[in-house]
């Protein structure tokens, strides 16, 4: 029997992190727990290692196995790649065995092309949603797979909003988004000298290669170095049937922790955006709402979500960091993992889990990273000086401590100034994964 490089979510489990990566193993585990996880499959970390051995190529054996699993996914969902009546659209996401939030790349809405988008608009009776999904896909594919910078597409969006006299992407109508998709394809051709690919299978293989390649992008390398993650581990790739948070005002997407990662308080902590897709929440494109506001907007989905949060925390016996999408009021879970937390939160969570009977005292001690304990001795401002200080801005604390430095407005400036011996505070409207090096060099980060 030939080597197995691909697993359906239903074939894996939470103990297969080395092979399926953290995200793939947890998607398999949630699937086995009967949670609402969109169907899909995981291409293993071994396939990534083989990709690098084969000089950045996916060999014929692995490609054939991937296509076999595409057919299985088509059978399971009743949808087909490129079909004009019931098209299969997928997301392609990375998933290393160690959690690396935001460090590698994601592509959504793969499978759309010029013909499918027209059929998709008719099938959903929602042309705005169809063309919004298509323009997002063209932008992500161009950026992640072909390495055409996001800025060119963001400039086209800004020009369109200015032309229409609106401030938000959500205020653009179907015709505006259709026009944007055409402009995006023209930009793609202008930058690369070729047409945007229309064959979903070519799109898929390009996306998988891009995720493998993203294991060695500069921010991933830097994150691995900071966190002692071996470079030869590679990343898995998760191919999952799409669910849509951007169909309208009964859909949305969000991220949440089962407890507050800054303080350890036993209360859901997170945010969501209505009529949005996954990356929007963390990309800082629009300002999200807090997770407790979901109870007012969609009470049934919120109740189901809180029940799932409790089950996941009980199952993993630790605080969870989750991603979810709501499509037309129906909740889907896209990820869970043990959440990153401050040292102070780690102490509180460990003690609370003991009190709640979830873990033993010995397990609680083992949960605390010894290296994190020095952060409990974090610097603080002199209370007397604070009273005299003039407040020029406020924000929500994401970690304990105080910081002092010159204000800078870009991650690049923060890095350059810090390397020249200056103390800096990085100020951004919202942070994004590209800011990681500047955030590391800054004394503090403020989002306003």
Predicted segments, located by residue:
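Nucleotide/phosphate-binding sheet-loop regions of phosphoryl- and nucleotidyl-transfer enzymes
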Residues: 1-389, 416, 422-425, 430-437, ...
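Long, terminal "pre-/pro-" and other extracytoplasmic accessory regions
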Residues: 218, 235, 391, 399-405, ...
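Long, structured protein-protein interaction/assembly regions in large complexes
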Residues: 401-415, 422, 429
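Membrane-bilayer interface helices and TM-boundary transition segments
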Residues: 444-448
